[in-house]
């Protein structure tokens, strides 16, 4: 079975519900969780159930649940997984923890070297075509001998940015002079459907 099939066919096990294992609620304090654990640990402790592998496995699950829910950092991570609706086990999700929530913006030339489980789309997307370099491509007045007001690779031409990124408005033909060259806040808000 492939990883994709495992995710599609995943059914959450009752053993992954740490709150249910300890017979407590999501709002239970660490003291309440500890008290519930003690009652259940006495019932399933390996010393009381010698040779019973099922009771030993249950005791290990209870111990893991207690350790996770009594540690505030681990509990926050567990609650994030529990409420996310992600179709993978908690242990599998923990194994991918360093990837979760990371958003990297890759340039066209950069390789994608890590998986990511972050589904939020970044505000700025990669360009379809890479930025062209060189003085000839930059246009007049932007060459290497320009004053400090010239454009450099660190400060690209604002006309090449999207309107949503605060770039200049697009124009075609000779209409540039009619609307004015300045980019006002009201015009930007209108273009971005904010008013």
From Swiss-Prot:
Keywords: Chaperone. InterPro entries: DnaJ_domain, J_dom_sf, JDP1-like. It comes from the Eukaryota. GO terms for molecular function: protein-folding chaperone binding; unfolded protein binding. GO terms for biological process: chaperone cofactor-dependent protein refolding. PANTHER family: DNAJ HOMOLOG SUBFAMILY C MEMBER 12 (PTHR44500:SF1). This is J domain-containing protein. GO terms for cellular component: cytoplasm; cytosol. Residues 126-163 are annotated as: Disordered. It comes from Drosophila melanogaster (Fruit fly). Residues 17-82 form the J domain. Expressed in the head. PROSITE patterns: DNAJ_2. SMART domains: DnaJ. The gene is jdp.
């Amino acid at each position: 079975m492939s990883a994709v099939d495992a995710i599609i066919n995943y059914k959450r096990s009752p053993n992954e519900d740490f709150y249910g294992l300890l017979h407590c609620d999501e709002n239970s304090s660490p003291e309440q969780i500890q008290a519930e654990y003690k009652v259940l640990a006495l019932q399933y402790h390996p010393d009381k159930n010698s040779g019973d592998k099922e009771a030993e496995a249950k005791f290990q699950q209870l111990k893991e649940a207690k350790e996770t829910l009594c540690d505030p950092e681990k509990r926050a991570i567990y609650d994030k997984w529990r409420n996310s609706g992600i179709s993978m086990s908690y242990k599998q999700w923990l194994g991918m923890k360093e990837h979760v929530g990371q958003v990297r913006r890759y340039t066209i030339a950069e390789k994608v070297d890590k998986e990511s489980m972050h589904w939020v789309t970044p505000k700025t997307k990669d360009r379809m075509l890479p930025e062209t370099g060189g003085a000839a491509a930059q246009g007049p007045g932007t060459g290497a001998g320009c004053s400090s007001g010239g454009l450099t690779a660190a400060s690209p031409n604002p006309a090449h940015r999207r309107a949503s990124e605060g770039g200049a408005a697009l124009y075609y033909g000779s209409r540039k002079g009619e609307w004015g060259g300045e980019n006002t806040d009201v015009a930007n808000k209108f273009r971005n459907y904010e008013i």
